[in-house]
Amino acid sequence: MRHRHGLRKLNRTSSHRLAMLRNMSNSLFQHELIKTTLPKAKELRKVVEPLITLAKKDTVANRRLAFARLRDRDMVTKLFTELGPRYATRPGGYTRILKFGFRQGDNAPMALVELVDRPEITEAPAEEAAE
């Protein structure tokens, strides 16, 4: 019986699942918006939100804990220099999951995962042709 067991296995071994969630966390911190399946998005939220809470207090111990989870020095630096201060006053709820239709091949429910309060990306102004 799997009563009260709050983990989705996602049809993967534990090492594969850990590596996948680590890679997805790094991608989310790098791009601040990713597209994935809905169950993966819900599991990703459980990994990312505690890391951002950890990054609110910049200590060597917290950086080491984050590095143990992410294994990417650049993402740990971004987490503690940009994301931690950005969400310093927000008491949780750093990610937003938006349903994004269904995948063409297997009809899997898709979702967008984004960090809330992320800066809007403005497109580069088109260079006007010289007259």
Curated annotation (Swiss-Prot):
One of its GO terms (cellular component) is cytosolic large ribosomal subunit. Pfam families: Ribosomal_L17 (PF01196). GO terms for biological process: translation. One of its GO terms (molecular function) is structural constituent of ribosome. Keywords: Ribonucleoprotein, Ribosomal protein. PROSITE patterns: RIBOSOMAL_L17. Gene3D superfamilies: Ribosomal protein L17. Belongs to the bacterial ribosomal protein bL17 family. Part of the 50S ribosomal subunit. Contacts protein L32. This is Large ribosomal subunit protein bL17. The gene is rplQ.
